[in-house]
Amino acid sequence: MLATMLAVGCSAWVIRAEETPPNLVGLLTVRGQCLKVSIARDDLTGRCTGELGMAVYADGRTGFHFMMRSRHIFTVSGIHSKQQSNAVQVDRIVLNDGLETNKPEVIAAEGSCTYGDPYRGRMTVRCAGKLGRLQDFVASFETDGTPPTE
């Protein structure tokens, strides 16, 4: 399980599943490479598959889904910034082990993501922040420049 693999130990910051945003309005998949995916000292970059999902919800929430081996997904999620059109204010990380029998683990976070337009060629998603006071996280992905699939 990805949550165990990460050994984050942040059960105090877990957000209830009923707080998950409804109303998906858009989902794109882009190809490229993970530049970095890590929590604290756990570097997960080598487990990335080269695919990134980008989800947009009706309430302004955006999720960047870093696809990992063994069907695991590392998601950085937050509300679209009102000050910057290409930024997201991160408020949670979602760890999904890919098994239908297990619910994803949602962990409160603080940070931000910036991104470019995937329809205009190569672009980079860069996310960074903290889980609680002690755990840093970083997640970045560079697309290969091909148009996204919807």
Predicted regions and their residues:
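Sec/Tat signal peptide C-region and signal peptidase I cleavage site
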Residues: 13-17
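A short, surface-exposed beta-strand/turn
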Residues: 78-84, 137-150
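An ectodomain-focused feature that recognizes extracytoplasmic/extracellular
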Residues: 18-89
